[in-house]
Amino acid sequence: MKKILVLGGTGFVGAHVCEKLVREGWAVTLPTRRRSNANALQHLPGLTVLECDVHDEAALAQVVAGQDAVVNLVAILHGNQAAFERTHVALPRKIAKACLAHGVKQLVHVSALGTDALQPQTLPSMYLRSKGEGEAVLIQAASGAVAGSGERGGFDLSILRPSVIFGAQDKFLNVFAKLQKIFPVLPLAGANAQFQPVWVQDVATAVVRCLAGASQAASPRTIELVGPEVFTLKQLVQLSGQLAGLGGGFGRPVFGLPDWAARLQAKLMGLAPGEPVMSTDNLDSMKVPNVATGKFPGLDSLGITASALQPIAQGYLQGR
């Protein structure tokens, strides 16, 4: 039985990835800061939960040792420069170093659509820049070296760049529907930003297919994960309200804000307690269309037909 380490496996996407890996016969190791974070997954046969801080380099090396493959899903949407650097750049560097040191043969890294590993500093947000820098670190490592580590060897690398991900437990369409239950009218920052939403199950399947060698592209390979339809943010907010049956089935009125008001709204939301719905960095990220560029292969290169959003979202938003 092949062994795999799934980093970030307790999250929305990670849970689906773990379930699919177990079904495919992998022995899954799932590190988490608190065992309780993995309560929903501990019933899976062949899955081992370990309490571990993966940002601790020594602890990470211990859990990487003996694995055949690693999946990295660790990511944040909000934070300051230091937080993005720690999560999206420093952690991939530590993962790469550990993979090289312990002879791990495969790494699947889930990044983000809209980033650029070649020129990350040209990107408009901390999120996208850090994602691109993290990709660059891994691409260098896949060829056999991590700067300053002295380790050599290389590994098979798949970088997956999904658009915004939807599914029954998402913090995307569900949030928009919830807001429309509270507010009769929604002023919206970034209303014209473009997205090509991809179903969480398609993303999880893509991870498993990469591990199975389904892609014919040479390593390191980058694959864009998108759905079949492009929406503006305003359309997605309106659709979530409609599918939830709000406003008589028409959703609440949604109107886009001018740039100055959008930045003010995003700034105020970013200061609110708890995880913000939006921040100024999110708004900056939306300057880059979150749609397929056509420069890289997509889901079809892995034998996956992209799932349409509306029939799936209706199933979990209807009557909420």
Provide a role label for each language-model segment.
Residues 26-34:
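Conserved glycine-rich Rossmann-like NAD(P)H-binding loop of the short-chain dehydrogenase/reductase
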Residues 3-26:
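N-terminal Rossmann NAD(P)H-binding glycine-rich loop of SDR-like oxidoreductase domains
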Residues 210-279, 293-320:
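Mid/C-terminal beta-alpha module of Rossmann-like enzyme folds, strongest
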Residues 158-175:
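Flexible, glycine-rich beta-alpha linker
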Residues 176-190:
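A short C-terminal helix-loop "cap" of Rossmann-like NAD(P)-dependent dehydrogenase/epimerase domains
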Residues 76, 90-163:
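Conserved Rossmann-fold NAD(P)-dependent oxidoreductase catalytic core, especially the SDR/UDP-sugar
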Residues 36-37, 43-101, 112-122:
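NAD(P)H-binding glycine-rich loop region in Rossmannoid oxidoreductase-like domains
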Residues 171-172, 190-213, 221-227, 235:
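Substrate-positioning beta->alpha
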